[in-house]
Amino acid sequence: MFKNLFKIKEREPKEITVVAPITGEIIPLEEVPDPVFAQKMMGEGVAVKPANGEVISPVDGEVKLVFQTKHAIIVEAENNAEILIHIGLDTVNLEGEGFTAHVKDGDIVKVGDKLMSFDIATIEEKATSSITPIIISNTDNVREVKNIKVTEVTAGENQILQVIN
């Protein structure tokens, strides 16, 4: 009798598509020259070798965190997937130099909204690499992450990941 009363209803899976937040060349995560990303310790995803210094929102959602050093941002999609865009490698050490945030924590964004801009020359001169991992940072809390096979992407146009949650 009480079995059905307390049964938690399983929700329907919701799939979202993540578009490229940066224009450039896709790099498989396993080939990123940083073991934290290459070994997927931060989560599943891909990376982009940027062709320009503009980052747009890859999903409709909410800005959860703009890192104080402006080298990374997390946007939460409508299905609760958290997309971490980490601009360059070892860029936290730049302490914000070369980065500009165009949004703040709590902002509601749509695909294509400008999130950040950065100076590629500064990053390539002072950091390890401009390669930018795009990670589902809460991979453990989503049902599935699928990479979409592409080699070159244009920000806001090409799909790079599907996330089912």
Swiss-Prot record:
One of its GO terms (molecular function) is metal ion binding. The phosphoenolpyruvate-dependent sugar phosphotransferase system (sugar PTS), a major carbohydrate active transport system, catalyzes the phosphorylation of incoming sugar substrates concomitantly with their translocation across the cell membrane. The enzyme II complex composed of PtsG and Crr is involved in glucose transport. Pfam families: PTS_EIIA_1 (PF00358). InterPro entries: Dup_hybrid_motif, PTS_EIIA_1_perm, PTS_EIIA_component. GO terms for cellular component: cytoplasm. Binds 1 zinc ion per glycerol kinase EIIA-Glc dimer. The zinc ion is important for dimerization. Its main location: cytoplasm. It comes from Oceanobacillus iheyensis (strain DSM 14371 / CIP 107618 / JCM 11309 / KCTC 3954 / HTE831). Zn(2+) binds at H71, H86. The record marks H71 as: Important for phospho-donor activity. This is PTS system glucose-specific EIIA component. The EIIA domain is phosphorylated by phospho-HPr on a histidyl residue. Then, it transfers the phosphoryl group to the EIIB domain. Its cofactor is Zn(2+). Heterodimer with glycerol kinase (glpk). The active site is at H86. The modification Phosphohistidine is found at H86. Residues 34-138 form the PTS EIIA type-1 domain. GO terms for biological process: phosphoenolpyruvate-dependent sugar phosphotransferase system. It is found in: Cytoplasm. Keywords: Cytoplasm, Kinase, Metal-binding, Phosphoprotein, Phosphotransferase system, Sugar transport, Transferase, Transport, Zinc.
